[in-house]
Amino acid sequence: MGQGVIGMSGRTLLDKIWERHVVRREPGKPDLLYIDLHLVHEVTSPQAFEGLRMAGRRVRRPDLTIATMDHNVPTTDRSLPLTDEIAARQMAALERNCSEFGVRLFDLYSPFQGIVHVIGPELGLTQPGLTIVCGDSHTATHGAFGALAFGIGTSEVEHVLATQCLWQHKPKVMEIRVNGKLPPGTTAKDLILGIIGQIGTDGATGYVIEYTGEAIRSLSMEGRMTVCNMSIEAGARAGMIAPDETTFAYLKGRPHAPQGELWEAAVADWRTLASDPDAVYDRVVEFDAGQLAPVVSWGTNPGQVVPVTGRIPDPRDFADPAQRKAAEAALAYMDLEPGTPIQDIRIDRVFIGSCTNGRIEDLRAAAAVVKGRKVAPGVRAMVVPGSGQVKAQAEAEGLDQIFREAGFEWREAGCSMCLGMNPDILAPGERCASTSNRNFEGRQGKGGRTHLVSPAMAAAAAIAGHFVDVRELLAEGGAAR
């Protein structure tokens, strides 16, 4: 069980990983955990490295520390000088710090550069049973591999750099059991938005979520990463999925994955990580995937969602006063009226990318909708691959040409429009169909209005100029992934 007694049977995936990594334990205090992989980027690391420098400390395990540039990087012509002074300083600082402290860096011009939560898995750095941290909220992405992965603050980044350990209270464990099969035209993004819509943005506060069930097992690794990525949006500390044959097939042969006899030994060990049949969870939530339709967020948090076939809710229909007030504020910010059909909402911008949906399967799904069609007049649409490797693969498959011919902008890898921290931002009042993970006020730029959707739904909105049920377009040709 989530707070299980050491040595007892019935351990969860979290129990097993946690116990392997406890360096020190004292009654009434947090456990000291060993960290297997520390991922670093340009935004949350400068102060941490400076703290080491001032204290005369070194990075304890530079071999377990990997850095990349993602949050602030330009996604247009990288041969031009950086125009954002803050971004330029942060990237220069990361280069200097990695050089001084011996940390491997995938810089702006590396073929392996990309969003930290995309490159970790694709390089085989992310593996089952590991503890993984990063100074970023969406580190939970790596939990799709059966790892314990969570975001940390800048002071904790410094602590891990210096000691390779971290003090942590053990969270409770919530099982989210996803029954049934995803209907045609629905995706992992629709699934996780539906789950957050059901349990709320604070529904998993204090927990690590373990996702189980038929629908989860049927997902590809990229789909599982999408689900785990947004666990934090339900308030969870992390999201996890037990490793299985799908996990092993994805990892085999990747640059940093074990090879030869080490691979066989690793897989044998990884098979033991799954929660025991008699494991007891602190809370169990069931979700019916079979009833899911493509989902669109209407408000200013990821729990404010409805099916694409639905309408904007009326705040008066919320029994809880806090939810009613939040709905009123969200509708005012989003400039929407209760009762408006989702498919009547017109959009100005489309963003396909991010650590949630910037992988090759996401781009294939969007391209399947876009192929042979054109972006609607007045809509500006862009595709930003999650990494240089994803970009190269997409170009090898001709996906970039499909997007370009339809009128999309094809960009370099980076976080881009997921957050208003780089040149790719919304103007005040612009409305965007986005495959990212947060629709908070101003998240994509001051006054910008964000609707969270799957890559296929974003592509469909770009073509129509408003939200449409992607299943109707797919019926004419192509298939969602």
UniProtKB/Swiss-Prot annotation:
Heterodimer of LeuC and LeuD. It is an enzyme of class 4 (lyase). Pfam families: Aconitase. It catalyses: (2R,3S)-3-isopropylmalate = (2S)-2-isopropylmalate. One of its GO terms (biological process) is L-leucine biosynthetic process. Catalyzes the isomerization between 2-isopropylmalate and 3-isopropylmalate, via the formation of 2-isopropylmaleate. Belongs to the aconitase/IPM isomerase family. LeuC type 1 subfamily. Keywords: 4Fe-4S, Amino-acid biosynthesis, Branched-chain amino acid biosynthesis, Iron, Iron-sulfur, Leucine biosynthesis, Lyase, Metal-binding. [4Fe-4S] cluster binds at C355, C415, C418. This is 3-isopropylmalate dehydratase large subunit. It comes from Symbiobacterium thermophilum (strain DSM 24528 / JCM 14929 / IAM 14863 / T). Its cofactor is [4Fe-4S] cluster. GO terms for molecular function: 3-isopropylmalate dehydratase activity; 4 iron, 4 sulfur cluster binding; metal ion binding. Pathway: Amino-acid biosynthesis; L-leucine biosynthesis; L-leucine from 3-methyl-2-oxobutanoate: step 2/4. Its EC number is 4.2.1.33. PANTHER family: 3-ISOPROPYLMALATE DEHYDRATASE, HOMOACONITASE, MITOCHONDRIAL-RELATED. Binds 1 [4Fe-4S] cluster per subunit.
